[in-house]
């Protein structure tokens, strides 16, 4: 019973999150296919649908197996029915899925609380204006909605990416400004989050879109939430002193099959690579720019240096 309830609770939360996103998309005047916020919500919604469908499919497979199994001699149908209901495969949510439930709940709860906070703030401003004999515009006007306006995602249509040279992407970004499009690697797609006009956080989906396993879906959803939640966090960048915790090595023959997760280009023999304490390695120029200008965490595993 506990296993079945655990699975049902997880599915209920995911369905609630799906309904929440549908409501936001329908009630918003943004273009869900072209605007940054619309793309973000649509992408998150599609992965939730995949996750829910996968869970239901697993349960159905288990029920079909039990229902097609012949009852043992001497066992009446009533007893068999109880056995079928009790033995249908129902999975306990994994640690990653429980974390996903918490994040979905937080997003929905914060959205429900926000109108109340805004109404209280508006009433307070209104009362202050009446006392001062002034008319002030409510502070909530013009405030960007963090769900619909703060995140943009660049997704390739077929998961293959474009063919522009990856090494050009970092320099091109500095020249053309933070809102210009980014080079998309051949293994997945890149998330661009413009927190402030002069800065942005870049997160990479490192698994191909063609792989539909539940682990990949959960990973992609978690990255979407990482991008969203970063909007309320002040950036913590590394210092030149903290970079000393890492080491610089030369790429060897064995590294030629690996790639830098930032620029998505393969390592070349004798290139200088920075190896972080978590053992992930990147081109020195790529990762130094990330650590000193954007975040003090590894772009892959989010471990602080």
Swiss-Prot record:
Superkingdom assignment: Eukaryota
Keyword Zinc: yes
Region described as Disordered: spans on this chain: 53-185
Assigned keywords, A-Z: Metal-binding, Zinc, Zinc-finger
Biased composition (Basic and acidic residues): 95-116, 128-142
Protein's GO biological process: ubiquitin-dependent protein catabolic process
SMART domains referenced in this protein's UniProt entry, alphabetically: RING
Residue ranges with Polar residues bias: 161-171
Leader sequence segment: none
Renumbered zinc finger spans (RING-type): 260-302
GO molecular function (one): zinc ion binding
PANTHER family reported for this sequence: GB|AAD18119.1-RELATED, RING FINGER AND PROTEASE ASSOCIATED DOMAIN-CONTAINING
Protein name: Uncharacterized RING finger protein ECU07_0330
């Amino acid at each position: 019973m506990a296993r079945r309830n655990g699975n049902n609770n997880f599915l209920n939360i995911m369905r609630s999150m799906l309904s929440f996103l549908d409501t936001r998309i329908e009630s918003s005047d943004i273009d869900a296919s072209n605007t940054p916020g619309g793309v973000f919500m649509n992408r998150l919604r599609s992965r939730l649908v995949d996750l829910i469908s996968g869970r239901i499919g697993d349960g159905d497979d288990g029920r079909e197996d039990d229902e097609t199994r012949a009852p043992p001699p001497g066992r009446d149908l009533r007893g068999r029915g109880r056995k079928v209901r009790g033995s249908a495969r129902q999975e306990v949510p994994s640690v990653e899925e429980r974390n996903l439930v918490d994040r979905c709940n937080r997003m929905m709860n914060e959205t429900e609380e926000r109108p109340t906070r805004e109404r209280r703030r508006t009433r307070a401003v209104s009362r202050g204006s009446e006392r001062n004999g002034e008319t002030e515009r409510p502070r909530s006007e013009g405030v960007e909605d963090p769900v619909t306006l703060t995140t943009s995602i660049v997704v390739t249509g077929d998961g293959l990416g474009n063919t522009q040279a990856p090494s050009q992407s970092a320099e091109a970004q500095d020249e053309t400004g933070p809102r210009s499009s980014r080079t998309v690697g051949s293994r997945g797609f890149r998330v661009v989050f413009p927190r402030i006009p002069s800065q942005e956080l870049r997160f990479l989906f490192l698994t191909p879109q063609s792989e539909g396993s539940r682990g990949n879906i959960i990973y992609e959803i978690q990255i979407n939430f990482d991008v969203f939640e970063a909007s309320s966090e002040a950036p913590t960048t590394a210092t030149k002193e903290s970079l000393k915790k890492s080491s610089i090595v030369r790429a060897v023959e064995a590294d030629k099959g690996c790639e830098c997760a930032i620029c998505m280009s393969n390592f070349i023999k004798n290139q200088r690579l920075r190896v972080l304490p978590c053992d992930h390695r990147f081109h020195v120029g790529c990762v130094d720019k990330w650590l000193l200008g954007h975040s003090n965490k590894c772009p892959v595993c989010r471990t602080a240096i």
